[in-house]
Curated annotation (Swiss-Prot):
Pfam families: M20_dimer (PF07687), Peptidase_M20 (PF01546). Catalyzes the conversion of N-acetyl-diaminopimelate to diaminopimelate and acetate. GO terms for molecular function: N-acetyldiaminopimelate deacetylase activity. One of its GO terms (biological process) is lysine biosynthetic process via diaminopimelate. This is N-acetyldiaminopimelate deacetylase.
Length: 376
């Protein structure tokens, strides 16, 4: 079967997923592809494991930016693809291979037929962690080419191909990682009175955390704490000296995030006192909410609905986290969901996006960018 140029690019990228700030092969692939465009109006900068590309406009008055995240996830792939990951224990399970491919397609179209305004493409590492958007935004490499408008997309397995979904205002939640390390006194299982059991302490903590949302967050607001991993102990007959909880916090408002963290800290302090142990809280990476610029989003939705073949859906906000929110704090813009019709969802080992969505996205985004960046 003959596949299109950009489907092949997606498959090439799918084979080489890499985690945050280790995307060296992916960066090399992007740079090699850009090299084939060989256009005098293209400038390229390297930032860590990312790439920033500028296509000079014919008569620029503003800079339009497109951001694509490029990293993969530490997940063992189960798709059965012939082009499955060749990196053991790694997979593009969040669609960043599609995001990057669409960016390269849009870049190709921009070089082929230049618009009036400058275009800047941000191939950003480490969206899945520890977070590449904020340091890229603050980098010297980007300051010179900082966009006036920026857009980004994320694949949506639940929507059919040929649809996009977005909304004005809040789209994605504030998110924070959560790590709690407990240290007590280990001992023999036959003498529990001489030890401080950190398995029991961790169990109490998980249970108490369930009250944080239900009794501290306005029912008309929304927030969630998920503890996804607990570790502790060594063997079955030794009382654990240490335990560790790992999870996430997600809120729809900045105020709720602050309130939730305050309650977590109070509960952990209570665990310390009750179990005579030491506790350390680490919030790890935190991502700011994705808040779409109202006027630009409304304009985009209207254009896509009236001027392209894509169907536009007004969605509700999601508890998903995205470090693109940091870019939208400083640069007016928006993010949208791109339908890819997969039976399995994001971060699943069997995620199989419909590749037909790739060229549909390139075509309609090229239409939008040409309309937005060309003086009438």
């Amino acid at each position: 079967m003959v596949v299109s140029k950009f489907v092949q690019i997606r498959r090439d990228l799918h084979k080489i997923p890499e985690i945050g700030f280790k995307e060296w092969k992916t960066q090399r692939y992007i740079l090699d592809y850009i090299g084939t465009l060989s256009n005098e109006h293209v400038e390229v900068k390297v930032w860590r494991t990312g790439v920033i590309v500028k296509v000079k406009g014919k008569n620029p008055e503003k800079v339009i930016g497109y951001r694509a995240d490029i990293d993969g996830l530490p997940i063992t792939e189960e798709t059965g693809y012939e082009f499955a990951s060749v990196h053991e224990g790694m997979m593009h399970a969040c669609g960043h291979d599609l995001h990057t491919t669409i960016g390269l397609g849009l870049l190709t179209a921009a070089v082929t037929e230049r618009i009036d305004d400058d275009l800047v493409f941000l191939f950003q590492p480490a969206e899945e962690g520890p977070g590449g958007a904020l340091p890229m935004l603050e980098s010297e490499e980007l300051k010179e080419w900082k966009p006036n408008i920026i857009l980004g997309l994320h694949i949506a397995p639940e929507y059919p191909v040929g649809t996009i979904a977005t909304k004005e205002g809040l789209l994605f939640a504030n998110t924070s990682e959560l790590y709690v390390d407990l240290k007590g006194k280990g001992g023999h299982a036959a003498y529990p009175h001489t030890a401080n059991d950190m398995i029991v302490a961790a169990s109490h903590l998980v249970t108490q955390l369930q009250s944080v949302i239900s009794r501290n967050v306005n029912p008309l607001d929304s927030a969630v704490i998920t503890i996804g991993k607990i570790t502790g102990g060594t063997v079955q007959n030794i009382i654990a000296e240490k335990s560790r909880l790992e999870g996430t916090i997600r809120t729809l408002s900045v105020e709720s995030m602050s309130r939730v963290k305050s309650r977590i800290e109070a509960i952990v302090a209570g665990i310390e006192a009750s179990f005579q142990c030491e506790a350390i809280i680490d919030y790890g990476a935190m991502y700011h909410q994705v808040y779409n610029h109202e006027a630009l989003t409304r304009e985009f939705m209207q254009f896509v609905s009236e001027q392209t073949d894509m169907k536009v859906i007004t969605c509700t906000e999601a508890m998903t986290g995205e470090d693109f929110g940091y870019m939208l704090q400083e640069i007016p813009g928006f993010m949208f969901w791109l339908g890819v019709n997969s039976e399995y969802g994001l971060h699943h080992a069997k995620l199989k996006p419909d590749e037909e969505a790739i060229e549909k996205a390139i075509v309609f985004l090229d239409q939008y960018v040409k309309w937005k960046g060309t003086r009438k």
